[in-house]
A protein has these predicted regions:
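ABC family nucleotide-binding domain
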Residues: 1-178
Length: 179
């Protein structure tokens, strides 16, 4: 493709960039010379919503959201569950908190993935083609959640083929072609 997903993976340090730098929180980080400490600090302020949800199949929606808070952020379980329930409510999935991924539609699974991202209180959320794995009739529910986040001022870096959506909710649109 044109390098959209690779670009997202590079700004989240999931892949090594050949050159350039990232400006985050007013500070410039050269890709070729960034410390593990700086990467960890940036990741604490970001969240990633993957194309194929990346939910744990053996965990409920609630536990998919709490897992990273408890294990990764060392948050007490009761606090993690409070944050997870609030995030699930925000994306319209609180009533499905005890459902497993196989019991949810693709759109519902992606909304759980968005709740997982929101629960970390990120400054920016990276979205990698969040609707590409969805049936067309389910795309609207995910875009609706993202539209609401944009209205609330959430900073998002979105890789998408939904050009109308991108134009309507974005401050800036970058069209990538040929890497």
């Amino acid at each position: 493709g044109s390098g959209k997903t690779t670009m997202l993976r590079c700004v989240n340090f999931l892949e090594h960039a050949d050159g350039g730098s990232l400006i985050f929180d007013g500070k410039e980080y050269p890709f070729h010379n960034i410390s593990k400490k700086d990467i960890a600090a940036i990741r604490q302020k970001t969240a990633f919503v993957f194309q194929n949800y990346n939910l744990f199949l053996n965990k409920t929606a609630l536990h998919n959201v709490t897992e990273g808070l408890i294990i990764g952020r060392k948050m007490p379980k009761t606090r993690a569950e409070e944050k997870a329930r609030a995030a699930l409510e925000k994306v319209g999935m609180l009533d499905r908190a005890d459902y497993y991924p196989h019991q949810l539609s693709g759109g519902q699974q992606q909304r759980v993935a968005i709740a997982r991202a929101l629960a970390t209180d990120p400054e920016i959320i990276y979205f990698d083609e969040p609707t590409s794995a969805l049936d067309p009739e389910l795309t609207g529910e995910v875009l609706g959640v993202m539209r609401q986040l944009a209205k609330e001022g959430m900073t998002m870096l979105v890789v998408t083929h939904e050009m109308g959506f991108a134009r309507n909710v974005s401050n800036k649109v970058v069209f990538m072609e040929n890497g």
